[in-house]
Swiss-Prot record:
Comp. bias (Acidic residues): 943-964
Subunit structure: Interacts with histones H2A, H2B, H3 and H4. The binding is coupled to RanGTP cycles. Interacts with AKIRIN2; promoting association with pre-assembled proteasomes. Associates with pre-assembled proteasomes; interaction is indirect and mediated via interaction with AKIRIN2. Interacts with PPP2R1A and PPP2R1B.
Classification via Pfam families: HEAT_IPO9_c, IBN_N
Stated role: Nuclear transport receptor that mediates nuclear import of proteins, such as histones, proteasome and actin. Serves as receptor for nuclear localization signals (NLS) in cargo substrates. Is thought to mediate docking of the importin/substrate complex to the nuclear pore complex (NPC) through binding to nucleoporin and the complex is subsequently translocated through the pore by an energy requiring, Ran-dependent mechanism.
Source species: Homo sapiens (Human)
Name listed for the protein in its UniProt record: Importin-9
Alphabetical list of SUPFAM superfamilies matching this protein: ARM repeat
Length: 1041
């Protein structure tokens, strides 16, 4: 207790007071550990009171490092201390809560804590290490210069606990190290880590693994710094790269034993991968040593993995790290695969993978085999089987990682991969034949893995066989392997995979062979089959429908459709969640095969889908799959009448039910389904949809306080207005209000300043559709809507809401420019100036952030029209407005930290509106050019690399690479995204109103280029060009201005 007494004295508090607080703290900690709930709750309240006292942290530190203290109290004190440091040590911290620890207390805590790193109890030691590292993040080197000397002394002390404690601090500290600390850290830490890593006789495997992990963390960090400060790597890491690399090469060759195991090799491989990724130029010379050794690790690990995991013919103990985490052997396999991915990502090393493809793919297939553990889990839990084997699974196993690697090489080297895979599969199948004949039971797993591999990349295989680029006996594979395996009963997983594989290769089959496989697939659905076979049969059916629709040979499927439908409905009745989703997805595609068949079965399909939708009403995935089925049924005219008779009353009763009587979210989903039906039905719509569903959705939207219901209600009314405005306008209620009146009520509600701003996220689309369809009939109402939009804009904070509102004005620029300008000039904005100024300021400050291809086109072309009008009509209303131009940075400011930003708020230039519009148009052109260029850079271009200059140290190539993505700001990447096709896959492309708009078809790059070229010819252009910056001039140069 001497340390505690000294601390009490140091803190300047009189002994008894300090002692009293400390005793209170011990009592409180004891209370928190109590099994009695009331006592615990009271103690947790009490700790909040003590937390704000000056001595709280000091007492926690004393209790933590007191070897005489009770173990439970010490552990709890160490955990609370760790939290205390996070929240009170430094006011700059994101988690900070006042008060800040006083200087006096900090000195005492820094004095006490390092003793805890020698602690024999690992949990206490780890918590102390965490606290020391968190303090060091703020205090080292200025306030705690001696810390690193202390840690280094511990590392060489020979005391195992002290070594572990110090390594824990360094591990945590380097993860959070700042770029101002790194130049001080790297020269001290890295040489020490090298010593620890290479002194196998002094330090244990886990400590040496930690040393490598710390090296890897530093390597990544220094690479990130290099982007901002050129030359950082040269000073901080290059001096040690060579010696580390040589040591890594040595370490990978040591067989497992007292100084090496799979966990250790995994860390070493991660380090080598980090070097290859971050400093490829520096690694070129070492590659000849590294590659054969990693290759050996890959091949030896494969044999070991097959024995211990796939076939489980050999028991092994997995290593455990110093925190008790099990380091499964699969982690080593993951890091080998990561290394290969890193080679693929770099043009310097890519061709090494290309040369090794036949062997590499042979081993990938070994790693793709099903393990005994998976057989056990999947047999017991079919849901898990569906989830793990799904293309978009979140599971991560060696099998999945091997598939990922196969797909990566197949994408990068299509022709070579096809040949390599054909050769590897042929070799495996021949070897499996020998294994099978010798009576070994696991031969089928290789068959399954070969089918999985070939089926995963089926397109490159079938194309290459068709073009004669590879010699692969496709017919032999289909009949002697897949069909033959279907007649064996070795494993349900082989049967299932064979059904799936067959469905991938219909293009290579004769109609007779397809029929044989379809017969087998339908039998596979049968209730007597194991779940895994039935599930695989469902996947196969999806494949057949998909493939045979593409090749226009669905007639082969027709005779099997009745039994397929029955099989699917039976299966859905027996399973929920994952299996059910798969069945629904497949049922949906089955509905599209033959409209006549689907119509004849509507009485089965529709009631089933409604029942499933109601039973799983709280599952959004099931709801959306049910919606897809209703969509398909709506598009078949013969199904429309009967389906609406069944479905619409159900949806109406949900919309009319009191909110507390139905599950949350059900009403919003019901409205969504109604929208789908309306959108996919050809007008005129039935009485049921107009006289029952329309009023129900309008009333429901007006009387709900649920955001999702309001949003979906607005979208549903937009569908009605878009599909059949006349019918909406003709219908009226008993009071004589017609459908348009109701739509107006809903618009007002969505824009009401009192409702949440998120209800307005789609209101812009509703208003724009309303204006485009009913423009002239709106009269006074239009002014009313626009006023509401202006007031909503003054409260909106979210970009999506603001964009939705501004888009209404953008659409009006296209259709009613002059009336719009008049209207906006007749109203005052929030500052008293005309509302036009407010709208243009909001629009121009956000245009570069807008997302969505369609929105991008509408707003960009509208800006062109505004600029053109402002010049041609010499319109003072636009010419006199000034808006924010560009941010002004002072030259001596350096890096803009939070504290600097607080002292010096942002400053902007102030420029004429029309100049700002020109700048935005140029920016849009730049973005769309970049997106188009990226889209045209097909993978074929990337894989043309000259293998002969492989090892040459190319300065230029390096420069180009570094200026690639690394130099882009996140904002740039986000800005270009609105024109990237695949960025918003589900965005407006499926919005029918956008698709119908001629603006959507515009080639924006051509339009903007043309506009700017014409604009540059105008006499006024001289005045504009003086305002352009270098970037903008460069963009204009690319189009010849």
């Amino acid at each position: 207790m001497a340390a505690a007494a000294a601390a009490g004295a140091a803190s300047g508090l009189p002994g008894p007071v300090a002692q009293g607080l400390k005793e209170a703290l011990v009592d409180t900690l004891t209370g928190i550990l109590s099994p009695v709930q009331e006592v615990r709750a009271a103690a947790e309240e009490q700790i909040k009171v003590l937390e704000v006292t000056e001595e709280f942290g000091v007492h926690l530190a004393e209790l933590t490092v007191d070897p005489q203290g009770a173990l439970a109290i010490r552990q709890l004190a160490s955990v609370i201390l760790k939290q205390y440091v996070e929240t009170h040590w430094c006011a700059q911290s994101e988690k900070f809560r006042p008060p800040e620890t006083t200087e006096r207390a900090k000195i005492v805590i820094r004095e006490l804590l390092p003793n805890g790193l020698r602690e024999s109890i690992s949990k206490v030691r780890s918590s102390v290490a965490y606290a020391v590292s968190a303090i060091a993040h703020w205090d080292w080197p200025e306030a705690w210069p001696q810390l690193f000397n202390l840690l280094m002394e511990m590392l060489v002390s020979g005391d195992l606990n002290a070594v572990h404690g110090a390594m824990r601090v360094l591990t945590e500290f380097t993860r959070e190290v700042t770029d101002t600390q790194m130049p001080l850290v790297a020269p001290v830490i890295l040489p020490e880590m090298y010593k620890i890593f290479t002194m196998a006789e002094v330090y244990g495997i886990r400590t040496r693994s930690r040393a490598v992990e710390i090296f890897t963390t530093c390597a990544h960090m220094i690479c990130n710094m290099e982007e901002l400060e050129k030359g950082a790597a040269k000073v901080l890491i290059f001096p040690v790269v060579q010696q580390f690399t040589e040591a890594f090469v040595q370490a990978l060759q040591i067989p497992d034993g007292p100084t090496s195991d799979s966990g250790f090799k995994m860390e070493v491989l991660k380090a080598v991968t980090a070097l290859v990724k971050n400093f490829p130029k520096h690694m070129v010379s070492s590659m000849q040593q590294i590659l054969p050794i990693v290759w050996n690790t890959l091949t030896e690990s494969a044999a070991f993995y097959v024995r211990t995991e796939v076939n489980y013919t050999e028991e092994v103990e997995d290593p455990v790290d110093s925190d008790g985490e099990v380091l499964g052997f699969e982690n080593l396999v993951f890091s080998i695969f990561e290394f290969v991915h890193a080679l693929l990502e770099n043009s310097k090393f890519k061709s090494t993978v290309k040369k090794a493809l036949p062997e590499l793919i042979y081993y990938i297939i070994l790693y793709m085999q099903i393990t005994e553990e998976q057989i056990k889990v999947w047999t017991a839990n079919p849901q898990q089987f569906v989830e793990d084997e799904d293309d978009d699974t979140f599971s991560y196993t060696v099998r999945i990682a091997a598939q990922d690697l196969l797909l990566a090489v197949a994408t990068d080297f299509q022709n070579e991969s096809a040949a390599a895979l054909a050769a590897a599969a042929t070799r495996h199948l021949q070897e499996a034949e020998q294994t099978k004949n010798s009576g070994t039971e696991h031969w089928w797993k290789i068959h399954e893995a070969c089918m999985l591999a070939l089926g995963s990349v089926k397109a490159i295989i079938t194309d290459s066989v068709k073009n004669g680029r590879i010699h692969f006996d496709m017919h032999g594979f289909l009949t002697n392997v897949i069909l033959a395996d279907l007649n064996l009963s070795v494993s349900p997983f082989l049967l299932g995979r064979a059904l799936w594989a067959a469905s991938r290769f219909t293009v290579a089959m004769s109609p007779e062979l397809i029929q044989q496989f379809l017969q087998a697939t339908v039998s596979g659905l049968h209730e007597t089959q194991p779940p895994s076979v039935r599930i695989s049969a469902v996947r196969a059916i999806w494949g057949y429908c998909d493939q045979l629709k593409v090749s226009e040979s669905t007639h082969v499927l027709q005779p099997f459709l009745p039994s397929i439908l029955d099989g699917l409905i039976h299966l859905a009745a027996q399973f929920s969640s994952e299996v059910l989703n798969l069945v629904m997805e497949t049922l949906c595609i089955v509905c599209t095969v033959d409209p006549e068949f689907t119509a004849s079965m509507e009485s089965k399909i529709c009631p089933f889908t409604i029942a499933i939708f109601l039973k799983y009403s709280n599952d959004p995935v099931v709801a959306s799959l049910a919606q897809d089925i209703f969509k398909e049924l709506s598009q078949i005219e013969a199904c429309q009448g009967p389906m609406q008779m069944r479905l619409i009353p159900t949806l109406v009763s949900i919309m009319q039910a009191p909110a507390d009587k139905i599950p949350a979210g059900l009403c919003a989903t019901a409205i969504d389904i109604l929208t789908t039906v309306v959108r996919n039905t050809k007008p005129p719509l039935s009485q049921l949809l107009i006289c029952q569903a329309f009023p129900a959705v309008a009333q429901c939207t007006l009387h709900t306080d649920d955001n999702a219901t309001m949003q979906n209600g607005g979208e549903c009314l937009r569908a009605y207005v878009s599909v059949t405005l006349e019918q909406v306008a003709q219908w009226h209620d008993e009071q004589g209000h017609n459908g348009l009146w109701y739509v107006m009520q809903v618009v007002s509600q969505l824009l009401d300043p009192r409702t949440s701003e998120f209800t307005a996220a789609f209101v812009g689309r509703l208003v724009s559709t309303l204006i485009s369809k009913a423009g002239r009939e709106l009269g006074e109402n239009l002014d009313q809507i626009l006023r509401a939009i202006l007031s909503k804009m003054q409260q909106a904070e979210t970009l999506s809401v603001m964009q939705s509102l501004i888009m209404v004005f953008a659409h009006l620029v296209h259709t009613q420019l002059e009336p719009l300008l008049e209207f906006l000039c007749s109203l005052p904005g929030p500052t008293g100036k005309p509302a036009l100024e407010f709208v243009m300021a909001e629009w121009t400050s956000r245009q570069h952030l807008f997302y969505g291809q369609y929105e991008g086109k509408v707003s960009s072309v509208a800006l062109c029209k505004l600029l053109q009008h402002g010049i041609n009509a010499d319109d003072k209303r636009l010419q006199d407005i000034r808006v924010k131009g560009e941010e002004i940075y002072s030259m001596d400011e350096g890096i803009r930290t939070r504290s600097k930003s607080a002292k010096n708020p942002e400053r902007w230039t102030n420029i004429p509106l029309l100049v700002k519009i020109l700048k935005l148009i140029i920016n849009e052109l730049s973005n769309v050019m970049e997106a188009n260029a990226a889209r045209q850079a097909t993978p074929a271009e990337w894989s043309q690399d000259d293998s002969n200059d492989m090892w040459e140290d190319q300065e230029e190539e390096e420069e180009e690479e570094e200026d690639g993505l690394a130099g882009q700001l996140l904002s740039d990447i986000l800005a270009t995204s609105k024109y990237e096709e695949d960025y918003y896959e589900d965005d407006e492309e499926d919005d029918p109103d956008a698709l119908k708009d001629p603006l959507y078809q515009i080639d924006l790059q051509a339009y903007l280029t043309d506009f700017l070229c014409q604009f540059a010819q105008q006499p006024c252009y001289i005045m504009f060009s003086g305002h352009l910056n270098d970037n903008e001039r460069r963009v204009l140069q690319t189009i010849g201005i």
